Amino acid sequence: EKYGATAFPLDYPNAWDRRLGRTGYGVWVHGMDRRNGQRPRLDTDGCIALPNERLLVLEDTFEPNVTPVIIGAELTWIDASAVAAMREALERAVARWAAALEEGDMFAWLALYDDDFRHWGMNKDEWSTFSLETVGSRDIAAVRISDLLLLADPVEEGLFLARFRLEIVEQGGAAVTTLRRTYWRRSESGALTIIAEANG
């Protein structure tokens, strides 16, 4: 009853949140306690509480790890042509990333990672060495991207999420599919590089 009519899990903190030092776990969007709908505004244990009626409208369309939930203080509309151009640039960047991985061109692949990239406590140089030893040693036959979702960060201008299903097929035929999240940063020159990433 405390969580109302329904609840949906969030991926907070995601890789970018952790990069910024944000902490927490078990964060949900949930309804309000029907027995006492007058809880203090911020009494949600770090979760987001919405009226039950609003959440029930979303219940049939919400899929965990599929439906994007964007939380921001305000909404800004931008020109559709600017959105289309940015989408095209991001799609090309993701395609270059996949092609370099498939071709085994580790230097082109690693060049798509930002100098300020961090992963598993490693800086870019440490992570590059690790990747050359692990990813670079794989005998990859094909890399396939599907279900690509592109989102702009609601707060930080020039930061984008590319979430997709990544299928890597080895030369022997074995295939592994994961859900990959890459966070791309656009530089002043317009170049896109990966600043953070995570599976799941």
Predicted regions and their residues:
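Exported/periplasmic cell-wall-interacting domains
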Residues: E1-A95
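Short, solvent-exposed aromatic-acidic interface loops
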Residues: H30-R34, L166-V169, I195-G200
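Hydrophobic pocket/interface hotspot
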Residues: W97, W109-L110, W127, A162, ...
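Surface-exposed, charged secondary-structure patches
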Residues: L132-R181
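Short beta-strand edge/turn micro-motifs at domain boundaries
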Residues: A174-G200
